[in-house]
């Protein structure tokens, strides 16, 4: 990694953080912040994968719909889908979602995960999350406790072998059932 060209490395990685950084301007301009020369077709494809296509199709002006600073005229989940689309328009080899889907409901999150697995560029997705629902279908889950790795495996494997994961899983399941 140390010998790898930083610019080349950054071109292969898309990062979406919990903070939803949207700018005053059109949907098109906000998505092109991820790839300046993105065509409308590429933008629509990124929006579709990010589960934001229908939302934008319903806005007057569609790609020319003007977002307020920080996307204040969108809901939290809509803002998250927009920032995910911005990262996807670059077709990164690695996509890091740092609690980036925390405002998505379970169905939208599941649809996003399915769409990411079926993209034509199939990125490696690294999801950082405190929500079991966001990661339970991941190929590999790494469980941290106070900065230490205490478990690694699939959801089913961790439920059998990692007490920390099982406690988190059970507590979140109880909240969903309540």
Predicted features along the sequence, with ranges:
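Conserved catalytic motifs of ABC-family nucleotide-binding domains
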Residues: 20-38, 74, 135
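C-terminal portion of ABC ATPase nucleotide-binding domains
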Residues: 41, 49, 58, 114, ...
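ABC-fold ATPase nucleotide-binding domain signature/coupling loops
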Residues: 2, 53-82, 97-100, 104-107, ...
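ABC ATPase nucleotide-binding domain helical subdomain, centered on the C-loop/LSGGQ "ABC signature"
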Residues: 3, 10, 28-69, 114, ...
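ABC nucleotide-binding domain signature
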Residues: 7, 13-17, 126
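Hydrophobic/aromatic position at a conserved helix-loop-beta junction
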Residues: 82, 88-89
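Hydrophobic anchor residue at the start of the ABC signature
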Residues: 84, 128
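A short, proline-enriched helix->beta-strand linker immediately N-terminal to the Walker B motif
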Residues: 89-93, 122
């Amino acid at each position: 990694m140390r010998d790898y060209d930083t610019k080349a490395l950054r071109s292969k990685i898309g990062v979406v953080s919990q903070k939803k950084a949207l700018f005053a301007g059109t949907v098109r301009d906000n998505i092109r912040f991820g790839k300046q020369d993105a065509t409308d077709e590429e933008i629509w494809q990124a929006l579709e994968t990010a589960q934001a296509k229908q939302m934008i199709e319903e806005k007057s002006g569609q790609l020319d719909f003007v977002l307020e600073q920080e996307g204040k005229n969108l809901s939290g989940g809509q803002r998250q889908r927009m920032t995910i689309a911005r990262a996807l328009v670059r077709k990164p080899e690695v996509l890091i979602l740092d609690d980036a889907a925390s405002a998505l409901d379970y169905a939208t999150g599941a649809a996003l995960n399915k769409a990411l697995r079926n993209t034509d560029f199939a990125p490696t997705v690294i999801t950082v999350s405190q929500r079991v629902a966001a990661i339970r279908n991941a190929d590999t889950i790494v469980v941290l406790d106070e900065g230490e790795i205490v478990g690694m495996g699939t959801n089913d494997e961790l439920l059998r072998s990692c007490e920390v994961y099982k406690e988190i899983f059970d507590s979140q399941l109880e909240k969903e059932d309540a």
